[in-house]
Amino acid sequence: MDYLSTTSSVLHPGSPIAAAGPSAKEDYALDGPTVSIIIPAYKVASFIDETLKSVFAQTFTDYEVLVVNDGSPDTEEFERAINPYLDRIRYLKQENRGASVARNSGLLSARGKFVAFLDADDLWLPTYLEAQMKFIHERGCDLVCADATFFGDTANERRTYMDTLMNDAPAADDVTFLQLVDAERSLITSGVVARRAPIMEVGLFDEALRNAQDLDLWLRLARSGARLSYQRRVLLKYRCRPDGLTGDAVNSHRRELRVFDKIEQSYDLSPQERGKIIEVIRNRRALLEFELGKLHAAQGDEVQSRESFARADHLRRTWKTRVALWLNRVSPNLLKAICSRRV
């Protein structure tokens, strides 16, 4: 790993300890930053300037910023973009090994008691860190995930992540292992602030997983007894782009299925937990087949579309699969038009 710059942001007086409550004082380091912001970067030269501006606009200022270049092919352009910030960030470079390794590099180099993850194309609102830290100390939790609005390459512009993709996510109280398993989508990594110690204790991100390593970590944290909470306040903007870290719905379901398969095969599960995992795997396979059906329909492949929708319907019968199969039969062109809309 190449430390091109190891200069960290200067710690500022006046961190909002009082706003977080008297019990929070022990979490504010005297010899280092309270929060380490970890930003993995791969092919984001055109986005990183805006992202860093959102970081340096934070009302909470007791932080350091670690930017980890994951062997990006646009490194020359990327380094030009971050050059104005080199005296305010710690810049780490590594060979391309994936987001999990990049985030772990940041975690191992971090000096803060808390870590905040941020993808290099997402944006925080100015009060993001202040609100997240206040929530953690008021609730006594180990991890909090805030809500986000979509922007970029999406038809869900200005809608929120949790309302769109996590309707079953609890609005209050701690998130249990089974609730996290049952949610249709994982926490937003760019919306997570957490105590660093529990993450180190459960073994960081699984570097064997090229994708969905964030979901895997949240599940291990919940299973270990760490307290995870949702904050329904919209505190960030979640960029949608086809080649981003998040990817499309088909790949998202495929990635998360690998995590649930890992859980079923390697966790010492209770009968209740095993039953729930089996149910979730079946439902996720249904969601994957439904998204594949939409993809085939958008491409005009009526046969493959019908077969995928039929498999989804067999795994979990819903009104959506019924309507999709009906449209495939009576009006494939209308189905194609509907499925061609970007979600």
Give the residues covered by each predicted segment:
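Conserved nucleotide-sugar donor-binding catalytic segment
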Residues: 108, 168-257
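Glycine-rich, basic loop-to-helix element that forms the pyrophosphate-binding segment
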Residues: 77, 94-110, 131
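Conserved donor NDP-sugar-binding/catalytic core segment of glycosyltransferases
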Residues: 127-160
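Short aromatic/hydrophobic "clamp" motif used to bind/position activated sugar donors
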Residues: 115
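C-terminal subregions of glycosyltransferases and related glycan-biosynthesis enzymes
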Residues: 2-30, 228, 240-343
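Cell-envelope/extracellular polymer assembly enzymes that use nucleotide-activated donors
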Residues: 33-36, 54, 64, 216
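A conserved hydrophobic helix/loop-capping motif in glycosyltransferases and polysaccharide synthases
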Residues: 35-47, 51-52, 58-59, 68
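Acidic donor-binding segment of Leloir-type glycosyltransferases
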Residues: 52-93
